[in-house]
Amino acid sequence: LNVLVSLEGVLSSDNSDNPNRAGALLYYALKAGHRVAIFTSWTQEQAEHWLLVNGFVGYDELIDNRYDLIGDELSKRQITVARSRQAVEMVVTAEPSLAAWSFENGIPALLFAHPDTMGIANRPDVPSKMRPWGSIEDVITKRNIKRSQ
């Protein structure tokens, strides 16, 4: 398989420069039998240094932030660029929206949900967000109609 693995949130923590041990385990399990490319929002120099210092070696490709275009989400653009080079058969990410986008675009996605590194906005145990005002108005309207009948 050709696998794309996100550096942020999978290999590294979102809130520190420390490597994620579970992410390292997953990386080396995938690397044992598959082609693994790493994508990141960092520069090539920053990413190569971090990967070397933290023992992530043997990756097949590094897709850095040079593919950023105004108006496009960088990670989606990176996946599109990777797909233009060869088949991408799996995306590993800690971002639920990117996993959903990958799935919608025909790429199997593995959502790496680690409680210590997943962004707070994406955690399933965070209290639900406030409802949009339009949704509240709809509920009030339906309730008023029901009461008037």
Region annotations inferred by a language model:
Residues 48-49, 71-76, 103, 120-122:
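Short, solvent-exposed polar/charged micro-motifs at secondary-structure junctions
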Residues 1-5, 131-149:
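Non-catalytic pre-domain segments flanking phosphatase-related domains
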